Amino acid sequence: MFLGKPKQGFRKIRLENASFSILNISRKDNSFKTQIECLNQTSHLNKNFPNQIGDSRIFLIRHGETNWNKEGRFQGQIDIPLNENGKDQARKTFEYLRNISFNKAFSSSMNRPYETAQIILQNNKELKIERIDSLVEISHGLWEGKLEAEIREQWPVLLKNWHDKPEEVIMPEGESIKDVSERSVEAFDKICLSQKDNDLSLLVAHDAVNKTLICNIFGINYSNIWMIKQGNGGITIIDLFNDPNKPPVISALNITTHLGGIIDSTASGAL
């Protein structure tokens, strides 16, 4: 079983010899919850990331930090810019990926992922970044701009459900995680279909968007978004195959070693 999910999930992840992966285990009453902090890290083996095994490869990255990320404030579709740390995270990601010759680039149409992509591509400024509306962050509706403590005062049950059963929550005047998954997966599928042999594509988006895409690749429901970690500036690598019988493979998930640590400290729950 793959973290209690269908056993065919093992075909969609990659674990190399002597690589390391980290799982966060939490206990509540008599049950346990598992969160994937990272998978198949190889930087300690003098390899920034595993060798490509597919016909093309996508580098999926979460945008750099904003002040609202730092404060733990729900930002959603409010277009908060990168703060100085977020710009530094993007620069460190550029350095980590310096030897990658991207020939395609995609971004959420919001500014924080677009600015992150621009910094990563600073040596390849002629490459056009396609901005995609369907990859914008989840709309938190009336929660946007609020701290979790403020939301707990007004919507305590809904906030608890967001943490425990996110698939059952529709944000007040906002979206559900199902809405995000449907639009994000549709956009990602189009990106995958556009890939040609040996394409190396950059895709910069958001926490909820990235998590729903990864859930879809793993073949698990979007209700499992909290099982996936996506740190600001974290890198996830997806290998794609021309053979329709071969599913995409997550060759590495949430690489953050280039940012100064293995464990990321992004605020939990605030997207």
Sequence positions of predicted segments:
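Phosphate-handling substructures
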Residues: 80-81, 122-185, 249-252, 264, ...
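GST superfamily/GST-like fold recognition
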Residues: 207-211, 249
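Phosphate-coordination/substrate-recognition cap region in phosphate-metabolizing enzymes
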Residues: 4, 21, 33, 91-160
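Short, conserved phosphate/pyrophosphate- and ester-handling motifs at nucleotide-, phospho-/glycolipid
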Residues: 63, 86, 206
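Acidic, low-complexity terminal tails and accessory targeting/binding regions
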Residues: 2-61, 70, 96, 141-150, ...
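Loop-to-helix element that buttresses phosphate recognition and phosphoryl-transfer chemistry
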Residues: 67-123, 154, 167-186
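His/acidic metal-ligating clusters that form di-metal
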Residues: 195, 203-208
